[in-house]
Amino acid sequence: MNNSRYVLALDPSGAYKEGSGTTGWCLYDIEKQKILKIGSLYAGDYSCQFHYWDAHIDLIDSMEGYHPDVVIEDYLLYGDRAEAQVNSRLETPQLLGIIKYEVWKRGLFIYIQTAAQVKTRWNNNILIHKNVIQKEGLNHTIAGTKVSDHILDSVRHAIHYSTYNSKYKRR
């Protein structure tokens, strides 16, 4: 059931062998409409693909006290990018499958959103206007911390889910 007060949003990249995968994540409090935690997982920090993938499960387990709904950006193969994926191992969809299964095993609610659902609706200008992020020079920050595009995307997913899909009733 998708009625948790908290949402863990993930913008996953499974690319371990095919580049430097980076997963951005955000823990969001729906009641206070506030970002509690943000971070990234970098494939290059792990000795093998399985350790990188396992770090995602460790992240989910570290949020156990919040019992969050988990929102994940889906992977879609768009026609204009399909040729670039020829002979690809499609590591990100593999990682998505692992995350979905592990979230289900833990009894957490999982919700999948596309990038297209959130990128326009919650663009940087809107997030700045709503005081979710700040612009400092060429960088975007959250509470004074410079954030990557992957973290920004996870924030977009958390806010979109909170606004349109969560069944949590704010007091």
Q: Residue locations for each model-derived region?
A:
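Phosphate- and other anionic-substrate recognition elements at nucleic-acid/protein interfaces
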Residues: 1-171
